[in-house]
């Protein structure tokens, strides 16, 4: 069950726009990659699954107390990630208090982020999420689990998660590049069907966060 902090947040925002955020981390990685992705996902979700999310996402640092204002925080990039001790403590408290962190590897982040996740949640394993998990079931069905958006190495797409007391608190999407699929159509020139898959999966993630 979500802790009191987030319960109060949801109660006070009922009927009003909620806000989600992009994580501005240290280490040299391009946390600012895919600038149009979150705004496009928000617009798509507001139009198709009746969310009421503010169109412009916030930007928040891992150690900031403002982190607790956002039920959903997104993180992406191509390279190095470093969480300081203060970052780790605040992020850990955020997740234990009911927050949700989605990390989308924009290709090149994997070797760095896995180490930081282990430091962040040393007592909880990062495990692969099966295709029958609810996050792949509604409102859009993905029978085979996470969709493939960009090829990169040609590996299969995988969704990993950290569960605490049976609640998914951290989602790590790997070898899919959802964020690229959320970008404006002319950024990567993805076929409309591929971009639609990415947006639908993103909508599923938001739906899961706001309803669990």
Where do the language-model regions lie?
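Short alpha-beta junction capping motif
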Residues: 20, 72-111
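Sec-dependent N-terminal signal peptides
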Residues: 3-13
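Aromatic-Pro/Gly-enriched surface loop or interdomain linker
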Residues: 16-72, 78-79, 177-178, 184-212
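Solvent-exposed loop/turn segments at secondary-structure junctions
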Residues: 25-29, 78-82, 100, 106-111, ...
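Stable alpha-helical elements in mature extracytoplasmic
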Residues: 37, 41, 87-90, 109-117, ...
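Acidic, glycine-rich loop-and-strand cores that form catalytic or ligand-binding grooves
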Residues: 116-146
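Short, surface-exposed beta-strand/loop micro-motifs that present aromatic residues
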Residues: 63, 154-170
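Loop/turn elements at helix/coil->beta-strand transitions in domains of secreted/extracellular proteins
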Residues: 18, 68-71, 96-100, 124, ...
């Amino acid at each position: 069950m979500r802790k009191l902090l987030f319960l109060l947040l949801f109660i006070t925002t009922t009927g009003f726009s909620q806000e989600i955020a992009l994580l501005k981390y240290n280490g040299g990685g391009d946390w600012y990659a895919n600038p149009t992705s979150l705004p496009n996902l928000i617009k798509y979700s507001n139009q198709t699954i009746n969310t009421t999310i503010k169109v412009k996402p916030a930007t928040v640092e891992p150690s900031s107390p403002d982190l607790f204002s956002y039920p959903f925080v997104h993180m992406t990039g191509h390279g190095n990630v470093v969480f300081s001790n203060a970052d780790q403590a605040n992020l850990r408290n955020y997740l234990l208090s009911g927050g949700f962190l989605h990390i989308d590897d924009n290709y090149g982040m994997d070797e760095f982020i896995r180490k930081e996740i282990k430091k962040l949640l040393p007592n909880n394993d990062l495990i692969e999420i099966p295709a029958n998990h609810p996050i792949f079931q509604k409102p859009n069905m993905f029978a085979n689990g996470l969709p493939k958006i960009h090829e990169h190495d040609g590996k299969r797409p995988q969704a990993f998660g950290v569960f605490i007391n049976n609640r998914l608190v951290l989602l790590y999407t790997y070898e899919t590049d959802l964020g690229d699929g959320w970008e404006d159509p002319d950024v990567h020139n993805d076929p409309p069907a591929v971009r639609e898959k990415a947006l639908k999966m993103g909508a599923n993630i938001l739906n899961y966060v706001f309803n669990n």
